[in-house]
Amino acid sequence: MTLYDENNLHIIKDNLRYLKLLSKQYPSISSASSEIINLQAILNLPKGTEHFISDVHGEYESFTHMLKNASGVIKRKIDDVFGTSLRECDKKNLATLIYYPEQKLDLIKKSEKNLEDWYKITLYRLIRLCQIVSSKYTRSKVRKSLPSDFAYIIEELLNEQGDRVDKQEYYNSIIETIIDIDRASEFIIAISNVIQRLVVDKLHIIGDIYDRGPGAEIIIEALSKHHSIDIQWGNHDIVWMGAAAGCEACIANVIRISLRYANLSTLEDGYGINLLPLATFAMDFYKEDNCENFKPRTIDKNLNETDIKLLSKMHKAISIIQFKLEGKIIKRRPEFKMEERLLLDKINIKEGTLSLNEKIYKLIDTNFPTLDKENPYELNERERDLVEKLTNSFINSEKLQRHIKFLYSNGSLYLKYNSNLLYHGCIPLNEDGSLKEVTLCKETLKGKSLLDKLDRLAREAYFFKKDPESKLYGMDMMWYLWCGSNSPLFGKKKMTTFERYFLDDKNTHKEEKNPYYKYRNDEKMCTMIFEEFELDADNSHIINGHIPVKTKEGENPIKANGKLLVIDGGFCKAYQPQTGIAGYTLIYNSYGLLLTSHEPFSSIHKAIVEGNDILSSTTILEHVSSRKRVLDTDSGEEIKKQIHDLEMLLVAYRKGLIKEENEANIRF
């Protein structure tokens, strides 16, 4: 530790106004000195554990379990603490109890013959485990994580050693009293939640909370209660954010995807979006149309034929509306350079064909009852009325708006954190691997400046309610971020939604990826990106999601000699046959980086009843010889700045530039 040079009085005088404000918080040499000592001590603690998860896609059961077991961290802690002193079945039961304390206790109360003994043994084990997971934090930080009902008792137990002879009776009496007064269950629930909280210091979600899974709103509700979280928006998140902002094209996309996968629970049950007007509209216009190409993909869903027919009609109806709304944006924003996606005017209804890239293709569906061949991108009166009703539903959904505000306040397009660069999709590149220049708002941008600009525009889409022009541009940009050719979230040249519905030729379905994906294994590309984002290439990593890792085909999630890590979570069941696993998560603790691959999760019910955990295997990517400390982190840098400021305050006190408060005044 280097103390502030007292001879630099001119710097202190320049900062005197700020130091006087700081003196309100630390009104004496004694209080400022104590805080410096505390902060300096914190710098020497081990860094907290970071947990990285990506591409959840609404699969709330798998995600909930992953959050509770911290990608196997809790199980490893149990192994570290109890080793061979516990049977494997006991370790498994202890882990399940920590993950799901309320539900597991209900089962144990029904099956355990000597509940009092079980309570005593379990309490000792949980306290011992909690002592270990809390040991890397200050008492103050641990105290803040404790539930108010048991804060004093847990703190006492954590800071006492049960094997110390002089305190053994005191320690044992606390545990016995907890059992005697019938508070053991509540205490077990409380301390299990504390263990869950302390085992991970920071949670990073690298995009795509939303998509086809049935419980995105459940996931966000859980995340909003997390003690420390950041989110890097994914393309599926941004389209929902655009929908909540009132972007009609985004609303149509969100509904279309939900119908495509027969997942209406998030829309209807989660957010109270009224889809009855869409159902009525679809039945009126597509009554005689079987909408064969719009049948929902019903993975793990048992739908009757009537439901499938209705969903298919709704699916087709909103798809046509989507293409019309997107056409309006493309025409309104020539700088997006997406004219090739204007396809409705290329349809020859009489011939049943589509003109695409100077070729004529036969349409496999030629029923377009709402299409005006003279003005194909104009909504008819019924469509306009429907879109207005749907938009009102999205804008006035209290829960949706609350969740989207959470995504804005805790999220961004990218994040630099502890020398790592986190983003969901890609950094747009040219074919030669150089950063691609994109013109937006008459500015030519690339790399970091491009992402910074897009981040600001995404916020304007939602928050610029009093500036209609800026808000409209922002909303159009939200749609562009969803499917635009230079979108860092989409990462492809075009989205071939229309072709997949209406053309048989598979070649027209192809979506060419940005050259970024070709260069992901190139260390030079990673170094270029690190330099662009002002990171040290020797000590940094890119942590990326979006594209599932095809482990089944031998693909490795570790790219560019460990500089780039792809952790698409693989939660989405539709991708698991392609990937062969349920994806990857990443743990970054004081010892280094651990990449964990996961097998598919069965269910929360089986986890509770049978103790089934997600089968995982862990690869140590990097192991440091000496543990990383808070000193080596971004938080450490902030603490060092605080220490520097407090040292200046000490000098100001000692030189008489600021007067200390009277000790009596401080006390009373």
UniProtKB/Swiss-Prot annotation:
Query: What residue range is the signal peptide?
Result: none
Q: Which GO terms describe its biological process?
A: gluconeogenesis
Q: Which UniProt keywords apply?
A: Carbohydrate metabolism, Hydrolase, Manganese
This protein's source sits in the domain of life called: Bacteria
User: What is the originating organism of this protein?
Assistant: Clostridium botulinum (strain Langeland / NCTC 10281 / Type F)
Q: What is this protein called?
A: Fructose-1,6-bisphosphatase class 3
Pathway membership, UniProt:
Carbohydrate biosynthesis; gluconeogenesis
Matches recorded under InterPro entries: FBPtase_class3 (IPR009164), Metallo-depent_PP-like (IPR029052)
Q: Which GO terms describe its molecular function?
A: fructose 1,6-bisphosphate 1-phosphatase activity
**HAMAP family, sorted:** FBPase_class3
Q: Does the keyword Manganese apply?
A: yes
Gene name of the encoded protein = fbp
Instruction: Give the enzyme's EC designation.
Output: 3.1.3.11
